Amino acid sequence: MNPLFGPNLFLLQQEQQGLAGPLGDSLGGDHFAGGGDLPPAPLSPAGPAAYSPPGPGPAPPAAMALRNDLGSNINVLKTLNLRFRCFLAKVHELERRNRLLEKQLQQALEEGKQGRRGLGRRDQAVQTGFVSPIRPLGLQLGARPAAVCSPSARVLGSPARSPAGPLAPSAASLSSSSTSTSTTYSSSARFMPGTIWSFSHARRLGPGLEPTLVQGPGLSWVHPDGVGVQIDTITPEIRALYNVLAKVKRERDEYKRRWEEEYTVRIQLQDRVNELQEEAQEADACQEELALKVEQLKAELVVFKGLMSNNLSELDTKIQEKAMKVDMDICRRIDITAKLCDVAQQRNCEDMIQMFQVPSMGGRKRERKAAVEEDTSLSESEGPRQPDGDEEESTALSINEEMQRMLNQLREYDFEDDCDSLTWEETEETLLLWEDFSGYAMAAAEAQGEQEDSLEKVIKDTESLFKTREKEYQETIDQIELELATAKNDMNRHLHEYMEMCSMKRGLDVQMETCRRLITQSGDRKSPAFTAVPLSDPPPPPSEAEDSDRDVSSDSSMR
């Protein structure tokens, strides 16, 4: 049952069922619809019924107002419909009684004219509610189907519903005739059972009198041509009311759906507005924090600029000095390498001269020995010749002394800490072994003394020795160049490390200065009452301490 309209429609059906009973009893005791057997139902009050909105909880005010409005309109329509139905029922009953009286009057007049010549008549029932032709009144009931005769037999067999009194013989004859002919004829499609029957029966008013045709109770009235017409104006009205109710219900559901959608959207918008307000508050707090951070960064930037103004100039000066020292070291080492090459070439030339002069010097020595053995007096005369050999030995000694001086100069040269890879080390590969020249010269002299004719072999050996020495010198030069390149890379790396350390030191200085200022500010804020206390000697300014730290770091890097 519909929770909204169910109770009202149920009352409406009760009103429709119970309307015929009280009205028929008040007007003459007859009933509609062929005299039904249902008991009369009490009429519902004509005022508006109590309206209870569906749903477990209280409805919103808009929906409650809409439902109350619709309920009041429905109750007004029900009241009007009930009054109109009562009026129509009274009109139909009066028309029926008027026609019944006219029929009785007409039958009485015909009875006076015909006298006793009239034929015997039987009860006749007519079904209404369709437009198909009706069988004539003269047709015997025995020729009718059983389906058509049975409803009228039931109606005629109820003596309480007949205003003319009991008719037991005619009812018995009708039932016997209908049962005897029910097997002969089948029900016709045109005579379908209806809801309302109007019947007329012939009764005898007294012994020996003509039978009188009397119209029974019912809602139908018969045209002069014998066609029954049903007057039903209530059902279309009820259908129209149902249509109106359905339309109102659809509109109510549509309004309810729209209201629920709007209510949901409003709730969502309220939630969204609350979220946006919270986000706006959080954004304001973040903005304030960022503003404080910006102020702090500005203060730190001012401090950093003040510290960097002096540090940059000092750092640039130190970098320039370092670059100049590196260039000077590279130039000095190139000059030393060139001098070493010149000395080695000069020594090679001296060795070649000694090699070719050794045989003559050996012959002179033998002659000198023979002369000394022969006469000791000749040794004094040989004395002035010794300076020639002494001059040669003095040249060799001078070359050796120059080489030794160059090596000592290399050892005594003060290299930087980051250029240790370029320091000269006298190893087996780098040390110039000048004894090889003299040993080779002595071996060549002995070989020449033994084989004086093999001069060509000596020349070849000398050339091979030159090639070997040249190769060794070239390898030494390549090694020195490699060490120079390595030293340059090391110097660049150390320079970058030094710059990174300087940047780290600057950052630490900035942080220390910031912390010092914050501590000073916090101390000033916390103890404003102790400003009058006499202070001790002021500490040295931070710039001097920082300068001393920078000098120490620069000295360590230079070392």
From Swiss-Prot:
Biased composition (Pro residues): 39-57
Sections of the chain in a coiled coil: 85-117, 237-301, 455-501
One of the record's GO cellular component terms: nuclear matrix
Residue ranges, annotated region (Disordered): 21-57, 158-187, 360-394, 520-559
Alphabetical list of PANTHER family matching this protein: 1-PYRROLINE-5-CARBOXYLATE DEHYDROGENASE FAMILY MEMBER, NON-HOMOLOGOUS END JOINING FACTOR IFFO1
Functional summary from the UniProt entry: Nuclear matrix protein involved in the immobilization of broken DNA ends and the suppression of chromosome translocation during DNA double-strand breaks (DSBs). Interacts with the nuclear lamina component LMNA, resulting in the formation of a nucleoskeleton that relocalizes to the DSB sites in a XRCC4-dependent manner and promotes the immobilization of the broken ends, thereby preventing chromosome translocation. Acts as a scaffold that allows the DNA repair protein XRCC4 and LMNA to assemble into a complex at the DSB sites.
Keyword Glycoprotein among record annotations: no
Boundaries of every IF rod domain copy: 73-526
Name of the molecule in the record: Non-homologous end joining factor IFFO1
Consequence of changing residue 89 to T/V: Does not affect the interaction with LMNA
Outcome, altering residue 480 to R: Loss of interaction with XRCC4
Basic and acidic residues composition bias: residue spans: 550-559
Keyword Secreted: no
Naturally occurring in which organism (per UniProt): Homo sapiens
Main location per the UniProt record: nucleus
